[in-house]
Protein backbone atom coordinates (compact mmCIF):
# COMPACT_ATOMS: atom_id res chain seq x y z
CA UNK A 1 0.00 0.00 0.00
CA UNK A 2 1.30 3.43 -0.83
CA UNK A 3 2.06 5.98 1.85
CA UNK A 4 -0.72 8.35 0.84
CA UNK A 5 -3.34 5.60 0.97
CA UNK A 6 -2.27 4.53 4.43
CA UNK A 7 -2.31 8.09 5.73
CA UNK A 8 -5.71 8.82 4.20
CA UNK A 9 -7.14 5.63 5.71
CA UNK A 10 -5.64 6.51 9.08
CA UNK A 11 -7.02 10.05 8.92
CA UNK A 12 -10.42 8.66 7.95
CA UNK A 13 -10.45 6.26 10.91
CA UNK A 14 -9.29 9.01 13.25
CA UNK A 15 -11.98 11.39 11.99
CA UNK A 16 -14.71 8.78 12.43
CA UNK A 17 -13.48 8.12 15.96
CA UNK A 18 -13.39 11.81 16.92
CA UNK A 19 -16.84 12.39 15.41
CA UNK A 20 -18.19 9.41 17.31
CA UNK A 21 -16.70 10.61 20.60
CA UNK A 22 -18.14 14.08 20.16
CA UNK A 23 -21.64 13.01 19.15
CA UNK A 24 -22.01 9.78 21.11
CA UNK A 25 -24.36 9.62 24.06
CA UNK A 26 -23.81 5.94 24.76
CA UNK A 27 -20.76 4.80 26.74
CA UNK A 28 -20.27 1.61 24.73
CA UNK A 29 -20.26 3.57 21.48
CA UNK A 30 -17.76 6.02 22.97
CA UNK A 31 -15.45 3.12 23.89
CA UNK A 32 -15.69 1.78 20.34
CA UNK A 33 -14.82 5.20 18.93
CA UNK A 34 -11.84 5.40 21.27
CA UNK A 35 -10.65 2.06 19.87
CA UNK A 36 -10.92 3.48 16.35
CA UNK A 37 -8.76 6.44 17.36
CA UNK A 38 -6.13 4.17 18.89
CA UNK A 39 -6.05 2.00 15.75
CA UNK A 40 -5.59 5.08 13.56
CA UNK A 41 -2.67 6.18 15.74
CA UNK A 42 -1.15 2.70 15.44
CA UNK A 43 -1.41 2.86 11.66
CA UNK A 44 0.42 6.20 11.67
CA UNK A 45 3.14 4.89 13.97
CA UNK A 46 3.83 1.87 11.78
CA UNK A 47 3.62 3.88 8.54
CA UNK A 48 6.03 6.59 9.62
CA UNK A 49 8.36 4.09 11.26
CA UNK A 50 8.62 2.24 7.96
CA UNK A 51 8.99 5.47 5.99
CA UNK A 52 11.78 7.09 7.97
CA UNK A 53 13.88 4.11 9.00
CA UNK A 54 12.75 0.64 8.05
CA UNK A 55 15.68 -1.01 9.86
CA UNK A 56 14.70 0.24 13.31
CA UNK A 57 11.48 -0.93 14.88
CA UNK A 58 10.79 1.94 17.27
CA UNK A 59 7.38 2.76 15.82
CA UNK A 60 6.40 -0.90 15.66
CA UNK A 61 7.39 -1.51 19.27
CA UNK A 62 5.55 1.60 20.43
CA UNK A 63 2.55 0.41 18.44
CA UNK A 64 2.61 -2.89 20.36
CA UNK A 65 2.51 -0.93 23.64
CA UNK A 66 -0.49 1.04 22.38
CA UNK A 67 -2.21 -2.23 21.41
CA UNK A 68 -1.59 -3.56 24.93
CA UNK A 69 -3.11 -0.42 26.44
CA UNK A 70 -6.09 -0.73 24.09
CA UNK A 71 -6.54 -4.36 25.14
CA UNK A 72 -6.58 -3.34 28.79
CA UNK A 73 -9.09 -0.61 27.99
CA UNK A 74 -11.21 -3.12 26.06
CA UNK A 75 -11.22 -5.42 29.09
CA UNK A 76 -11.81 -2.83 31.81
CA UNK A 77 -14.10 -0.44 29.92
CA UNK A 78 -17.10 -2.76 29.51
CA UNK A 79 -16.80 -3.84 33.14
CA UNK A 80 -17.02 -0.21 34.24
CA UNK A 81 -19.94 0.40 31.89
CA UNK A 82 -21.83 -2.65 33.20
CA UNK A 83 -21.22 -1.51 36.78
CA UNK A 84 -22.59 1.94 35.96
CA UNK A 85 -25.57 0.32 34.24
CA UNK A 86 -26.28 -1.81 37.31
CA UNK A 87 -26.28 1.25 39.55
CA UNK A 88 -27.91 3.84 37.27
CA UNK A 89 -29.96 1.67 34.84
CA UNK A 90 -28.60 3.69 31.93
CA UNK A 91 -25.48 3.82 29.78
CA UNK A 92 -26.11 7.33 28.52
CA UNK A 93 -23.19 9.65 29.15
CA UNK A 94 -25.27 12.72 29.96
CA UNK A 95 -27.29 10.81 32.60
CA UNK A 96 -24.35 9.30 34.46
CA UNK A 97 -22.90 12.14 36.48
CA UNK A 98 -21.00 10.12 39.07
CA UNK A 99 -20.02 13.13 41.18
CA UNK A 100 -23.55 13.78 42.43
CA UNK A 101 -24.04 10.60 44.41
UniProtKB/Swiss-Prot annotation:
Enzyme Commission identifier(s): 7.1.1.-
EC primary class: translocase
Cellular component GO terms, alphabetical: chloroplast thylakoid membrane; NADH dehydrogenase complex
InterPro entries on file: NADH_UbQ_OxRdtase_chain4L/K, NUOK/Mnh_C1-like
Membrane-crossing segments per the record: 2-22, 32-52, 61-81
Localization annotation: Plastid, Chloroplast thylakoid membrane
Pfam families: Oxidored_q2 (PF00420)
Biological process per Gene Ontology, one example term: ATP synthesis coupled electron transport
Main location per the UniProt record: plastid
Membrane topology designation: Multi-pass membrane protein
Keyword vocabulary terms for this entry: Chloroplast, Membrane, NAD, NADP, Plastid, Plastoquinone, Quinone, Thylakoid, Translocase, Transmembrane, Transmembrane helix, Transport
Reactions this protein catalyses: a plastoquinone + NADH + (n+1) H(+)(in) = a plastoquinol + NAD(+) + n H(+)(out); a plastoquinone + NADPH + (n+1) H(+)(in) = a plastoquinol + NADP(+) + n H(+)(out)
MF-aspect GO terms: oxidoreductase activity, acting on NAD(P)H, quinone or similar compound as acceptor; quinone binding
Purpose of the protein: NDH shuttles electrons from NAD(P)H:plastoquinone, via FMN and iron-sulfur (Fe-S) centers, to quinones in the photosynthetic chain and possibly in a chloroplast respiratory chain. The immediate electron acceptor for the enzyme in this species is believed to be plastoquinone. Couples the redox reaction to proton translocation, and thus conserves the redox energy in a proton gradient.
NCBIfam families reported for this sequence: PRK05715.1-2 (NF004320), PRK05715.1-4 (NF004322)
Family affiliation: Belongs to the complex I subunit 4L family.
Assembly, per entry: NDH is composed of at least 16 different subunits, 5 of which are encoded in the nucleus.
Protein name as it appears in the record: NAD(P)H-quinone oxidoreductase subunit 4L, chloroplastic
Amino acid sequence: MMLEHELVLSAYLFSIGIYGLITSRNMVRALMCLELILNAVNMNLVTFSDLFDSRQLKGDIFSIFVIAIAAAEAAIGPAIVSSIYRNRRSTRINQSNLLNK
